[in-house]
Amino acid sequence: MKILAIGNSFSEDAMRYLHEIAVAGGKDVQTVNLYIGGCSMETHWNNIVNEAPLYMYQKNGQLSDRYVSIQEALDEQEWDIITCQQVSHCSGLMETFNPYCEKIYAFVRERKPNAALWMHKTWAYETDSQHGGFASYDNDQQKMYEALCEAYGAAAASVNVPIIPSGDVVQKVRTVDPFIYQKGGISLCRDGFHIHLLYGRYLVAAVWYETLCGGNILENPFVPQTPELPDAVVDPEALAVIKQCVHEYCSGKCE
């Protein structure tokens, strides 16, 4: 299976461990993230129009020094799945999605008619996030989550694609120990908006694994680690909480 994300740092987070999780689950999954930090759907569309070679080509969760256009990446191989998402601070602002979302998906459908198209539903910011875009939601996590649910639902319906429910599962895990941040638990964000390098990236990759690859994360032995946190030790009980929440949500919602 070959998965391409037309994305930004939030799809970078989602794909960091996806290939490794798939390998551990005995699945042949290749991933590519087209990365521009903070890239909106409007900018993606403008980059398509201009055939701009501005995207870092991140294969199987790894950075590279290769930069490509969306057209070059699409034409490179036969993708099984192609995803796109809105930039996080606009994720709950419905007016920012279209017409760009519709134009992107129409272009990709014409270019790659055999690929299955999906939309990646991203997550709300941490309750104390200092991101400037949080003000659009009155600095309220629940308000941001509800807004992005509405916006992603409408956008996905407008282009007739299913949703990868990362934002839903993140919000679910935030209600379970040890991830209840407002009670002193672990935040699933590393800086108030990007997802935690270990637990958060694992969570979102697990959602993609179950949703797109048909895997069962409960049976998967992969344990995340990163050179960015060389001394970090993953708590197996915390990981088990994530796995259970992901599987419960995805097995019920993603069949």
Question: For each predicted feature, which ranges?
Answer:
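Conserved SGNH/GDSL esterase-like catalytic core that processes O-acyl groups on lipids
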Residues: K2-L4, F10-N98
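A structural signal for well-ordered alpha-helical scaffolds and beta->alpha junctions
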Residues: S11, M15, C101, Y145-C149, ...
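Intrinsically disordered, low-complexity coil segments
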Residues: Q58-L63, H131-G132, L229-V233
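Alpha-helical cap/lid subdomain in secreted, periplasmic
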Residues: Y67-L197, E210, E219
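Conserved catalytic region of serine esterases and O-acyltransferases that act on ester linkages
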Residues: G185-E255
